[in-house]
């Protein structure tokens, strides 16, 4: 077993950030196991998540730290953080307040396909994005 | 709701591959909800997955198509494929034969930290990698 696959190194030393300094974080409801979203973290947002126990990401579109729920109020309380064998993907077990998805659904994975062509909605709408984020001008 | 967030376009048209032509795929046990791994797909591996209903990825380390389980026998039968709001992450619901992780665990996420420093093993060893893949020379 290589050094990156065991538990000898510290957690932060084990995380492998990519060439942009980011690592993907899968977010899962800690009680139901439902996968809610995937987002990206840099070292700063990971440290903030560990410190505050609230999920904090790096927004690639806005190029800034993103405390999940800072606009919508839909914060994520972090219960556990897991890391994969290669150290290059994280899994957060959270309690999600409201919906995780900016479109208004509970999960960002609100569409599924079985035939590879058609898609259908497979999740519950939790809020109206225009009410939460304001109307787009 | 933008075009990329609804169900009007076809599934394959909705998938947004990154600048390497890849999209991350989260893999979840379809019965227990346990997150097993994350891997990457290109268009070819996604089409093969849809066609065969067996998970097929793009191996970034070997730079080739990777039918999951082709070496270990630990195939993944694909029940559903979901796509997130931005179209840039997939979620596969699968039946996993044996362990998903090449280290021998059921899930690649076999280590967790709660304090951000120490890590502990939180999963079950399913097989001995040396027996399955052969000894490393």
From Swiss-Prot, chains A, B:
Pathway membership: Amino-acid biosynthesis; L-histidine biosynthesis; L-histidine from 5-phospho-alpha-D-ribose 1-diphosphate: step 3/9
Compartments, record wording: Cytoplasm
Any Gene Ontology biological process: L-histidine biosynthetic process
UniProt binding sites for Zn(2+): 85, 101, 108
Any one GO CC term of the record: cytoplasm
Positions with a binding annotation for Mg(2+): 84, 86, 88
Disulfide bonding pattern of the chain: none
Enzyme Commission number(s) of this protein: 3.5.4.19
Gene3D superfamilies reported for this sequence: Phosphoribosyl-AMP cyclohydrolase
Substrates-to-products reaction catalysed: 1-(5-phospho-beta-D-ribosyl)-5'-AMP + H2O = 1-(5-phospho-beta-D-ribosyl)-5-[(5-phospho-beta-D-ribosylamino)methylideneamino]imidazole-4-carboxamide
InterPro entries: PRA-CH, PRib_AMP_CycHydrolase_dom, PRib_AMP_CycHydrolase_sf
Enzyme class: hydrolase
Alphabetized GO MF terms: magnesium ion binding; phosphoribosyl-AMP cyclohydrolase activity; zinc ion binding
Task performed by this protein: Catalyzes the hydrolysis of the adenine ring of phosphoribosyl-AMP.
Assembly, per entry: Homodimer.
Family indicated by similarity: Belongs to the PRA-CH family.
Protein name: Phosphoribosyl-AMP cyclohydrolase
Native species: Chlorobaculum parvum (strain DSM 263 / NCIMB 8327)
